[in-house]
């Protein structure tokens, strides 16, 4: 390892940190809905095919560059490029990932703040007496209350900042080795509860009964997009975490475990969320509306709903915080190595600046909602920037670099696998991953 580079103390800590980064709120509120709307079990089969054909090679590529470079994403890319006889300007690709992580953090921090606010409400009331109108008015009231949103955003960022400030082993490892097993335990426990609470059979049918008649071009594109966006690549986080890997760690096995765990969380989330929707005849919805408007109505009606609500929002809080840690670790690593601030002060500056920029995101829901650029407010413009441009562009350039330009011997030595496995990985990266991400980028722009 390079002098001064932190090292994960165990494989378990690394896997938990990487899974925590990959598993975000989108796994819980988007994947089940997208699955049901796109053919159920047939979509799951197609998604699993793409997540292993696209997700695993992408994760392997980022981890490999990170470990080879043993530095921040931009410096790792530049170092590996130079080692391969290429221009250090390739480091800009790593810098693009850091920029994407920073941009996502600004709006994501506000959503984590919502989750924390709803956790407080769950603890206080359990959403007793909520109906659809009350749930909607509560969420709309929160969006209109800029002060409360800002306070909760600051609270979430203080938690994330404290973890990053404490360092890789003293902060991130300690947090994720507690929080991620807790997340899995809560998912499994809440899923088991739903097995006996009604609506479970309908959920299994909705999510897993194949309807191959629904598999068409848009559904395939949805599966490709879900496979790419759900695994945390193109944001520098995997590369930063990879830079802390010891030489004897198997990147191939690690990537498989990360993608498997990420997919398992998404599937388990469907078994937690949708039995409540079916059992209480609630409106099917995707995104934030599902979590903050639909489910509180279910919590109000179900036996033990108060406890269920608390555990559910604890689970969401864990998913949100661990994702934010991965995003801001990439930015902190970059800041630490680009400046003379040092690790701790870099963490303070990064988290502080994200919190300041989040003011624009908070106020875009209320007092600044009418201030637009090209017809979009701050949040819409930010999300359009990273969803449609910087995230897929960064993923595409990394895949191009590793698949087509990085010296084969370097990649082979880092992966330390047999020729057949290496050949399959390289084939997928060159001829499946690159075209797939290019399609995501192009369709997002047209």
For each predicted feature, which ranges?
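Inter-helical loop and helix-membrane interface segments of multi-pass membrane transporters/permeases
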Residues: 5, 34-38, 68-96, 109-169, ...
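Helix-loop-helix connectors at the membrane interface of multi-pass transporters/channels
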Residues: 1-2, 112-144, 244-248, 253, ...
